[in-house]
């Protein structure tokens, strides 16, 4: 039924027309009058659609401008992670291409011959404490996307005690207050991925629910599927309405130390021989774990225990080097959140300056190398060395500086406390005077 208001007819009863489309007041639902002009409800809707599309286009253009270039991503990673130049380059290109694919995917779909861009998930391989998790965390913070870390060792096949692989997506949803659209553009880091390698090359009568079984369960999730996730999680609330999350645009980064992988690589790459055909090598020719990883091929991961289908879902492989003494000293001092800067800020809150002598930093790096835990061991060393000092300082008066040298790190002396000079009050005059 046509709805006319007093605005859609003049005082003389003359038939009115829309000034934009030319339709009469009887052909439209509503005609709105302005100063000597009229507009119908259909033209208003059309204007709203045009404005809405322009806003969306400008928003998408603005968001694409905010996407940092690969060299910018690498430069920002340099501020937080020391070394690992090649790994940063691989990550920067992979992440840039992934989010470029998301932001321009709709435009390529309108082409005469649309090209579907595949997703490039990432595998980080490197020794403990080399910066795998920190790289993933820094990327997510840089791109301002939801980020979650999952531990592969806690995952099991559905129906067994442990976490389902869908719980990973639920954790991602929790990070963005169950905003499905945001979660679908997030980053998931699966740590300890090497711990779910197949236990044996030979088929077994017992089911490997935490190894190959988990790899099988992760296949579709990583490649892209519609995951059904309960808002409150788990199997305890089957009556809840499930959220449908498309994982095809979620970037999965898997990381692991892969202890023993260097031997697998050497067995493949180093040709053996007998007698005069044998290749002679000195002990000095033996490369360390990180250097050996540079020759990593997908087939080595399969021999290590990852199933071929799972390796195929992780086309981008970045290897990280072992951290040497010089790199550990840099980690202590150079990054934005370097440990020496963190402890400096803690002591500054008490009005005290802390001074780490160069020989102290050298000794900390030496102890970390002995522990073979990479950069992860640096904080525990610093905590144990500074524990007593941090216990005393809040109660001590007039302390202005703490000096830490090599002997302190080795446990042979205590940190040197420097006090401010306090003037003693003059003695009161005696009664005899």
Swiss-Prot record:
Chain segments annotated as coiled-coil in the UniProt record: none
GO cellular component: HslUV protease complex
HAMAP family membership: ClpX
CDD domains the record matches: RecA-like_ClpX
GO MF entry, a single one: ATP binding
Function description: ATP-dependent specificity component of the Clp protease. It directs the protease to specific substrates. Can perform chaperone functions in the absence of ClpP.
Binding sites annotated in the UniProt record for ATP: 127-134
Family that this chain belongs to: Belongs to the ClpX chaperone family.
Species per Swiss-Prot/TrEMBL record: Cellvibrio japonicus (strain Ueda107) (Pseudomonas fluorescens subsp. cellulosa)
Keyword tags: ATP-binding, Chaperone, Metal-binding, Nucleotide-binding, Zinc
Sequence positions that bind Zn(2+): 18, 21, 40, 43
Name of protein: ATP-dependent Clp protease ATP-binding subunit ClpX
One Pfam family cited in the UniProt record for this chain: ClpB_D2-small
GO biological process: cell division; proteolysis involved in protein catabolic process
NCBIfam families linked to this entry: clpX (TIGR00382), PRK05342.1 (NF003745)
Subunit structure: Component of the ClpX-ClpP complex. Forms a hexameric ring that, in the presence of ATP, binds to fourteen ClpP subunits assembled into a disk-like structure with a central cavity, resembling the structure of eukaryotic proteasomes.
Start and end residues of each ClpX-type ZB domain: 5-59
InterPro entries assigned to the protein according to its UniProt record, in alphabetical order: AAA+_ATPase (IPR003593), ATP-dep_Clp_protease_ClpX (IPR050052), ATPase_AAA_core (IPR003959), Clp_ATPase_C (IPR019489), Clp_protease_ATP-bd_su_ClpX (IPR004487), ClpX_bact (IPR046425), P-loop_NTPase (IPR027417), Znf_CppX_C4 (IPR010603)
């Amino acid at each position: 039924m046509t709805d006319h208001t007093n605005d859609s007819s003049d005082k003389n009863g003359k038939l009115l027309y829309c000034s934009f489309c030319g339709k009469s007041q009887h052909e439209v639902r509503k005609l709105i009058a302005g100063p000597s002009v009229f507009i119908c409800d259909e033209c208003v809707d059309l204007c709203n659609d045009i404005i809405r599309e322009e806003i969306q286009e400008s928003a998408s253009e603005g968001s694409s401008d905010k996407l940092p270039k690969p060299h910018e991503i690498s430069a920002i990673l340099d501020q937080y992670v020391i070394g690992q130049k090649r790994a940063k380059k691989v990550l920067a290109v992979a992440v840039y291409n992934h989010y470029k694919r998301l932001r321009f995917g709709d435009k390529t779909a309108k082409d005469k011959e649309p090209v579907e861009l595949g997703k490039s998930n990432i595998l980080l391989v490197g020794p403990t404490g080399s910066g795998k998790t920190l790289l993933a965390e820094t990327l997510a913070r840089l791109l301002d996307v939801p980020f979650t870390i999952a531990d592969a060792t806690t995952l099991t096949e559905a129906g067994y005690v442990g976490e389902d692989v869908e719980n990973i997506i639920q954790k991602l949803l929790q990070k963005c207050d169950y905003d499905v659209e945001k979660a679908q553009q997030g980053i998931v880091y699966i740590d300890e991925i090497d711990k779910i390698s197949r236990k044996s090359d030979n088929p077994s009568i017992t089911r490997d629910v935490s190894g190959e079984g988990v790899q099988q369960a992760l296949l579709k999730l990583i490649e892209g599927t519609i995951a059904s996730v309960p808002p409150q999680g788990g199997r305890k609330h089957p009556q809840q309405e499930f959220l449908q999350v498309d994982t095809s645009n979620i970037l999965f980064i898997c990381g692991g130390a892969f202890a023993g992988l260097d031997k697998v690589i050497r067995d493949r790459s180093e040709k053996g021989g007998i007698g005069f055909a044998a290749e002679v090598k000195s002990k000095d020719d033996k490369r360390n774990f990180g250097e050996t990883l540079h020759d990593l091929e997908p087939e080595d991961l399969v021999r290590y225990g990852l199933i071929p289908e799972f390796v195929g879902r992780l086309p981008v492989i970045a290897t990280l080097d072992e951290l040497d003494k010089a790199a550990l000293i840099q980690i202590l001092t150079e990054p934005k959140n370097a440990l020496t800067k963190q402890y400096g800020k803690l002591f500054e809150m008490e009005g005290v300056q802390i001074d780490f002598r160069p020989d102290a930093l050298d000794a900390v790096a030496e102890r970390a190398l002995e522990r073979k835990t990479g950069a992860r061991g640096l904080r525990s060393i610093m905590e144990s060395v500074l524990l007593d000092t941090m216990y005393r300082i809040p109660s001590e008066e007039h302390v202005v500086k703490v000096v830490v040298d090599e002997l302190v790190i080795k446990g042979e002396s205590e940190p040197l406390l420097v006090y401010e000079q306090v003037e003693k009050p003059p003695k009161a005059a005696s009664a005899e005077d």
